[in-house]
Amino acid sequence: MAKIKGQVKWFNESKGFGFITPADGSKDVFVHFSAIQGNGFKTLAEGQNVEFEIQDGQKGPAAVNVTAI
């Protein structure tokens, strides 16, 4: 899978999910905290730049292997 760059649209820490807007302007992608790479508390900040891959989830496309850049 190819890495895609994007920006966090919003992320709800208490619910553990949010959405990423891909840099190419395509449809926002769902992101779950379990897809965030790294140790410790996994969260994303609104406006944060990230790289990720897209995988088909139960409710449509979802971001996986998410890393901050």
From Swiss-Prot:
Domain of life: Bacteria
InterPro entries recorded: Cold_shock_CspA (IPR012156), Cold_shock_domain (IPR050181), CSD (IPR011129), CSD_CS (IPR019844), CSP_DNA-bd (IPR002059), NA-bd_OB-fold (IPR012340)
Predominant subcellular localization, coarse grouping: cytoplasm
GO cellular component terms listed in the entry, alphabetical order: cytosol; membrane
PROSITE patterns documented for this protein: CSD_1, CSD_2
Record GO terms (molecular function): nucleic acid binding; protein homodimerization activity; protein-folding chaperone binding; RNA binding; single-stranded DNA binding; transcription antitermination factor activity, RNA binding
Domain (CSD): residue spans on this chain: 6-66
One Pfam family, short name: CSD
UniProt keyword annotations, A-Z: Activator, Cytoplasm, DNA-binding, Transcription, Transcription regulation
GO BP annotations listed: cellular response to heat; negative regulation of termination of DNA-templated transcription; regulation of gene expression
Protein location: Cytoplasm
PANTHER family, alphabetized: COLD SHOCK DOMAIN CONTAINING PROTEINS (PTHR11544)
Name of the protein described by the UniProt record: Cold shock-like protein CspC
Species annotation: Escherichia coli (strain K12)
